[in-house]
Amino acid sequence: MKGRYNLMIYVGIDIAKLNHFASAISSDGEILMEPFKFTNDADGFQLLTSKLESLALQDDSLIIGLESTAHYGDNLVRYLVASYFKVCVLNPIKTSSMRKNNIRKTKTDKVDTYIIAKTLMMQDSYRFVSFYDLDLMDLKQLGRFRQKTIKQRTRLKIQLDRKSVV
């Protein structure tokens, strides 16, 4: 087990609407966790974290990567950051170029988890999601909600004006 403490663990998570897939590889390329499916809810998140906690030798030896995808992964990212995991949201363009380098051109959720983990492993530096980033996500969401509400209010005022003219 000499040198085992320098081992980094890279977790790739493929995000989808209802279910996500995750796998883990070591910095020497060994598959530590075969791809498995978990639900996009608290039960699924707890399943994931229990598997991750059994892998990590040290708190800083595990890095989680996932592609930036709409809003489907937001709750998972919040959960993982709140659980003090290091989470890195990857640009899909980077994973796409890694996918092109893959010998097998198949695109499945299970294969994508490895590609995401390998993309993470090849990074020179990481930008981890912080609590500040989560606050910014909330602020953006509130801004979009405000814009939508103002638009709806304007539409209703116009309808009200039309009805009062008649």
Residue ranges of predicted features:
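Short, glycine/acidic-enriched loop or turn micro-motifs at the edges of active sites
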Residues: 17, 70, 94
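Short, basic/hydrophobic alpha-helical segments
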Residues: 43-61
